[in-house]
Structures are given as C-alpha cells and as structure tokens.
C-alpha cells in the first residue's frame, strides 16, 4: 500500500472511512474520483419518506455500463500519465473492455426494449443508474438503510399494485423479510439480484435476463 501511486475512488460510503488511512500510508498517491464529470442522481425513496432520507448522491454509478465506459476512459488516461511507457498496453486493454461494455449495453437494450411495464420494485435502491440508462423506474422499499414502518409498507404495496409490479428484487446483502411481505400482498415473488457480484459483465447480463423475464 505504501508504494501506491494512484488511488481510484467511486463514491461508496466505506471509502470515507479508509481514505484518510490510505493518505497516511501512501502520502504520495494521487486520489482520483471517478465520479468527476458524471451527472449524479439522488437516491430514490419510497412514498412518504422525507427528502434527503436516503442520502445523496446515489453511489451506484457502476451499474450503468454507459457510465462505466466514461470511468474506463478516465482510468486509461490516469494510467498512461503514470506509466507512459506502457501506453500501448493500456490502450489495448481499454479498447477490449470498451468493446465488451458496448456489447453488454446493446444486449441489455435489446432484452428490455419491448417491455411495456417499465417499473420495478427493489428493497434497497441500488439500480437507479441502471434504470435511467434503460428507460426503467425503480421503486424502493427501504430509505436511509432503515426498514420501512407499517405506514410506508402499506404505501409501497399500494404503489406496487397500481404500477403492475409483480416482483420485488432484493440483493443477498439485505434481509428479505419486508420484500416477502410485499410479494405476498401483491401476489408476486421475491427475486435476488446482486449489484456487488465480482463478474461485472456476466452479472449484468444475468441481471438483464432476470429483469427481462420478470418485467411484463
């Protein structure tokens, strides 16, 4: 760590805890915020939640391939500035990754293009940038990392019924209790999708397939 010359951050909350320590261990390292130049969105909230409850901005920028392409450009440029002798290698790696991202982006668009119901319900609001990129709308259950109260839960259920939602998406890192309650109330089901899976390309293909099978 002490020999690090470049630190890339993406804006997830835990970075705020370790970046000061990183600055002590590697004082010469350049810190690059990959969100710079991106249009950030607020965190989506369930009905009845107070503005700002979820914190802002939404940190989940990596779930939109078009935004990841822009971040990849920045990483390439920073690496070339750091090691100009490896420019050819960095550019080749970048080109392959961008080609994979473009193929992924096109595949997701084709899978979701014909869906008439564009709303989907999630327990934790991780998928806002993904929704923006592909013309969808996420409807969250949770606000500010807190479980919904009875009033919010009822409003969420009514919103799901009015929007034609039949699936509640959850991620493995969170409790499924409230999601199962909502699914039972709307005659739907709970389906797991993981925004933190290590295989980025493969995972988003699986997520797109899950969305395509569960959106009407």
Regions found by a protein language model. Give the residues of each.
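Extracytoplasmic metal-acquisition and chelation regions
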Residues: 1-216
């Amino acid at each position: 760590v002490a020999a690090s010359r470049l630190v890339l951050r993406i804006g997830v909350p835990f970075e705020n805890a370790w970046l000061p320590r990183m600055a002590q261990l590697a004082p010469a390292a350049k810190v690059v915020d990959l969100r710079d130049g991106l249009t950030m969105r607020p965190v989506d909230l369930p009905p009845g939640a107070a503005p700002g409850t979820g914190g802002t901005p939404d940190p989940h920028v990596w779930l939109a391939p078009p935004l990841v392409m822009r971040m990849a450009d920045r990483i390439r440029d920073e690496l070339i500035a750091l090691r100009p002798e490896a420019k050819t290698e960095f550019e080749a790696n970048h080109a392959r990754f961008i080609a994979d991202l473009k193929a992924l982006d096109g595949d997701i668009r084709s899978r979701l293009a014909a869906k008439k119901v564009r709303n989907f319900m999630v327990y934790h609001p991780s998928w806002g940038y993904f929704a923006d990129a592909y013309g969808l709308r996420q409807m969250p259950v949770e606000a500010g990392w807190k479980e919904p109260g009875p009033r919010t839960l009822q409003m969420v259920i009514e919103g799901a019924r009015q929007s034609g939602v039949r699936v509640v998406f959850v991620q493995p890192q969170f409790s499924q209790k409230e999601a199962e309650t909502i699914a039972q109330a709307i005659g739907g089901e709970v389906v797991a999708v993981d925004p933190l899976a290590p295989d980025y390309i493969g995972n988003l293909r699986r997520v797109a397939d899950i969305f395509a099978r569960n959106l009407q």
